[in-house]
Amino acid sequence: MTLLCRPAILSRCLPLCREIPNPRKGDPAMRKALKILLVLLLTVLVLAAAYVAYVFLAYYRIEDQQVLTVEGSVTETLRPGQTCRAISYNIGFGAYESDYSFFLDGGTQSWAWSEERLRENLDEIAALLQAENADFLLLQEVDVDATRTYHFDESAVLRAAFPDRACVYAQNYDSPFLLYPFTQPHGASRAGMLTFSRYAVSSSLRRSLPIEGGFRKFLDLDRCYSVCRLPVEGGKELVLYTLHLSAYSADGSISVEQLKLLLADMQAEYEKGNYSVAGGDFNKDLLGNSAQWFGAADREYTWAQPLPEDIFDGTGISLAAPLDEKNPVPSCRNADAPYHEGQYVLTVDGFLVSGNVTVEEAAVLDTGFAHSDHNPVSLTFTLNAG
């Protein structure tokens, strides 16, 4: 079929064709706006790529078997048959007061409330530990220079509180600047673990722990445990370990691998005839099922799994989980909200001992989570003679 273009039809179509805009002759203001938008988008992409490169380039891990400095001039030595007391306390970088929630746990805060409140809380933590007067202090999450704690050296406060103790610092966190949350970036953090001893420490070592690979390694600490060697009369040693195992992992298996490495070290010392005691934050449900003791069971919280039942088989090492069955107190609260009645709580802090160490008591010190998302835990133990 042949279509004939009549003059009347053409006269109607031509004005419409003239109204179709030519993209090459667009509105100057529109072209300028598009250019600005493209420049902004390109700038954002370049900055994002530069930040990712910075995070990757800044990442490093401290080598295994790092020799640690033992501070202080303590000379008193232990003896077989002696009873001692140790306290382990994750101080939550001094920020986790009872009204605090942390953004990585689903809460709101990324910094301590204020530098003034931070210093007051640290003074109260130091006073609490002084009043307990334990022989050994095993402390985790101690900031030495961090955006989140106003670049205040928390270790200086704790060292000043125990000037007559031997002291060992082991770094396990040195993160690049974290830009999130955007309203108050978490920033850069350098932190670690402190060990204080009333008795002489002859040497100390830092053991690096395995961590997850891929992107998750940027979310985890540079996990480790410190090893302090204390002479005991008669030629033996007390080998004291301070630890903080992984929490933010895909399925919790990496912390089991970390624990196996620690157990192998402790077993080797025990087989030499030395005493082995370890304490810290395991990030595992050390009671197996904390909900049966404290209630508030919630399947949403799966970050702290029970330890494998057979993990201690053949090691000569046993778990000393702090529990008073008549008055059970948890050692940790979930930090997705300020502390409140019915909040998810459990026990993740505790101790390991070798077969030649008798556990007299393992207990949680009930602070009501006033200073941290953890309560301190204590172990009274005896170094068996013979």
In which residue ranges do the predicted regions lie?
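Active-site beta-strand/loop signature of hydrolases that rely on acidic residues for catalysis
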Residues: 85-91, 121-151, 196, 228, ...
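N-terminal, active-site-proximal structural segment of metallo-dependent hydrolase catalytic domains
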Residues: 32-164, 169-190, 385
